[in-house]
Amino acid sequence: VVSAGLIAGDFVTVLQALPRSEHQVVAVAARDLRRAEEFARTHGIPKAYGSYEELAKDPDVEVAYIGTQHPQHKAAVLLFLAAGKAVLCEKPLGVNAAEVREMVAEARSRGLFLMEAIWTRCFPAVDALKSLLAQGALGDLRVARAEFGENLTQVLRSVDWAQAGGGLLDLGIYCVQFISMVFGGQKPEKISAVGRRYETGVDDTVTVLLQYPGGVHGSFTCSISSKLSNTCSVSGTKGIAQLLEPCWCPTELVVNKERKEFPLAPEENKKFNYRNGMGMSYEAQHVRDCLRKGLKESPVIPLAESQLLADILEEVRKAIGVTFPQDKH
């Protein structure tokens, strides 16, 4: 586990609730040894390291889970790939398209597994939606819509320009991945966007229109200063399907007013930092399945689609005039 932050804490809590014969957390690394040791004590992890390099050298580590801040993803991914490890990296995989391309090229050249942790795609409610679409239950598709907004202006990371904060990379990626998923991972023909910037220079609230081949389109809004409906929907000539709030970790799917529930495993006495934390188990099990099959990437979140999502988000940022220090000008 690379990082001793909040999301890493949730992931470890989930892994330890799964069978030990299938998942074992062998070590954690942070850039501050004290934090790593404290995290290891809290979660009962045998080894703690004060640098990522030491963790990369640990022969007991088969898979590295990277839960650092956005701008640290690339260096960490490249470090663990160079050490011959499989890598599951939190979204967004990179701050921009160039970073993502570099990581994907490295994984492919080394023949190692790399996956962007878009956990939403591993949820049973999303599987059910994909099945419906595959069966043509909604008829010919016409439009998809997604919204994700929370007031995160008190969360330092969310408004920090140097850390590539803002809504698009943190929340917008969930919206884009939904629209991309329902339209089969195609490249949009046209992207337009409007938005406002926060006083620190990150994007605050953004609305995006995506025109796809075949006359279908999608739109999404993401915001770090206002609460939105946090739902996703797709409509066709025979009806509408909606993932209810929280659509980034959904447990309810409504198809033409018929509601289906996909409850999570009970949390019992576990403490999570984020909503529906138990849902990270779907992602963990998916990575295990991929590795057992000898796959180098996930069929659910293929690397080509991670590249496409990064391309779209970068184009949106250009349209609204948001650049980060990690962007090459």
From Swiss-Prot:
Keyword entries, A-Z: NADP, Oxidoreductase
Enzyme class, broadest EC rank: oxidoreductase
Tissue spec: Lens, liver and small intestine.
InterPro entries tied to this protein: Gfo/Idh/MocA-like_OxRdtase_N, Gfo/Idh/MocA_domain, GFO_IDH_MocA-like_dom, NAD(P)-bd_dom_sf
Catalysed conversion reaction: (1R,2R)-1,2-dihydrobenzene-1,2-diol + NADP(+) = catechol + NADPH + H(+); D-xylose + NADP(+) = D-xylono-1,5-lactone + NADPH + H(+)
EC nos: 1.3.1.20, 1.1.1.179
One annotated GO molecular function: D-xylose 1-dehydrogenase (NADP+) activity
One of the protein's GO biological processes: D-xylose catabolic process
Subunit composition and interactions: Homodimer.
Annotated family: Belongs to the Gfo/Idh/MocA family.
Name of the protein in its database record: Trans-1,2-dihydrobenzene-1,2-diol dehydrogenase
